[in-house]
């Protein structure tokens, strides 16, 4: 067992070394790749307190305490997912935190498209989905967490992307989930991480290019949705996404509601 553990640690270290070398010309901070960690998001939030550089990256082959939206547990199996977090240093006066999770979701879809996966869409706010027989199947989840001091924030955005399912459907029998292995030949995990991180460097949040790309890949816009916010439920047409990432829904009476948090169900 000790030898197998050492092999896992060395394999992860090697992947991190290769990735750091490939991304050296770009403006990334520390890039770490572990065999196992509690949570890549928490790793970077802790490092933020010590003042580590902008665009630090944490990747793991396995997480033991991963979290999804609404404090749900994020379940993954060893070496079956890309588990990656990126830290941004943010001026809250000019850049809403929500735009950084949008930035990561668009970067992932664009990177996957370049690797041959062209049918992946974004379900608001930032789930990546595939569509089988008219039903949405979750391929990846994105979670943003932050520490705020005055008008400055350290924002950590984490990604859990299913590469293969192994036994995940047995563990989550009631969930509609998917993996890259079900829709094509899974890419090398280093190539995948590199592609996503390169895409992150493309977008300047001070122009409309990010929003335009988000709308291009959105599966939610133009569909009828049921929205659940706190204890309120309403239905309408998903019309557009605002500059801060909120979803605008047109109700049957012609009025519009803007939501920044909540669960949506696609009706048709």
Model-derived regions: residue spans:
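N-terminal lobe of the biotin/lipoate ligase/transferase fold
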Residues: 1-114, 134-138
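Long, positively charged amphipathic alpha-helical accessory segments at protein N-termini or as interdomain linkers
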Residues: 2-14, 18, 93-120, 130-268
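Short, basic and Ser/Thr-rich N-terminal targeting/leader segments
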Residues: 52-54, 124, 232
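Short loop/edge segments at beta-strand edges and connector loops
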Residues: 35, 122-124
